[in-house]
């Protein structure tokens, strides 16, 4: 990866950490999930408003490291307006990217900013926490999601 690309990716992560998108509660959410990463201390909640099979709105709140917060912010942008199946597909491609099992070619530049995370296994949990919570919420599961035992 070129130095310019690394700088761009770092800038994207820092910007979404400082000014996260969709950092709010959806009062009339049809689904909600809580996520916890005990290793890093990340704690967040994800709200989803489904309209039939479509993610009409998605938001999050919580605290965590820059990677966790930026990933949650970008996740909300990536899945809003998508069908459940499309959102799950984006989840799968993002997880493949951060675990080094995919190149993220189909993901936008924002999500590809997390491509270097695969080199730091503990940070994979930070990057994927909001995604696991979102997947749990759209599946209608109510139990908290933990990164313990997951990638």
Feature locations, PLM:
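Contiguous, function-dense segments enriched for cysteine-driven chemistry
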Residues: 38-49, 54, 66, 96-99, ...
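Alpha-helical support elements that line or immediately flank enzyme active sites
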Residues: 71-83
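Alpha-helical macromolecular-interaction surfaces
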Residues: 69-70, 89
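Secondary-structure capping and boundary motifs in well-ordered enzyme cores
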Residues: 40, 67, 119-123
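Structured beta-strand/loop patches that form or line metal/cofactor-binding pockets in enzymes
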Residues: 19-62
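Short, thiol/selenol-centered motifs that function as redox-active sites or metal-ligating centers
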Residues: 62-69
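C-terminal binding/interaction regions
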Residues: 1-27, 82-151
């Amino acid at each position: 990866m070129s130095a310019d690309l690394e700088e761009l990716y770092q800038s994207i992560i820092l910007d979404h950490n400082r000014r996260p998108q969709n950092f709010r509660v959806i009062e009339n959410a049809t689904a909600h999930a809580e996520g916890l990463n005990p290793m890093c201390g990340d704690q967040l909640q994800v709200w989803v408003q489904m309209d039939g099979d479509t993610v009409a709105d998605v938001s999050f709140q919580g605290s965590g490291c820059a990677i966790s917060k930026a990933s949650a912010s970008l996740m909300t942008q990536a899945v809003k307006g998508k069908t459940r199946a499309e959102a799950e597909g984006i989840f799968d491609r993002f997880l493949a990217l951060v675990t080094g099992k995919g190149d993220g070619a189909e993901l936008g530049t924002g999500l590809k900013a997390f491509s270097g995370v695969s080199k730091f296994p503990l940070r994979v949990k930070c990057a994927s926490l909001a995604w696991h919570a979102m997947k749990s919420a759209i599946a209608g599961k109510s139990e908290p999601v933990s990164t313990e035992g997951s990638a």
